[in-house]
Amino acid sequence: MTAGTMTYACDGGRTLAVTYGRENDEDIITINPTGRGDEMLISFPVAEGLQYSWPSDGSYHVWALKGGTGTLSYRDGERGITTPVLTNCRA
């Protein structure tokens, strides 16, 4: 993924700005899905597409891209449940 910011239009008329970059030899993104502050997510290998999340046993967001379409989910570490937040996101 090329460094820079991309804005994705998602279902329900919502948008998400995703800033792609590199830090400490890792592919990262910065997002602000809640409007309360930026979150940095790190790239993790997956079978198909790209996935970014935060290595944590707690709660965190996951940004997954496959075939040009993104999904932002929220992983509740306490309950072990992952819930889609933004779906069908396209640049």
What function would you assign to each model-found segment?
Residues 1-91:
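Cysteine-centric segments in proteins
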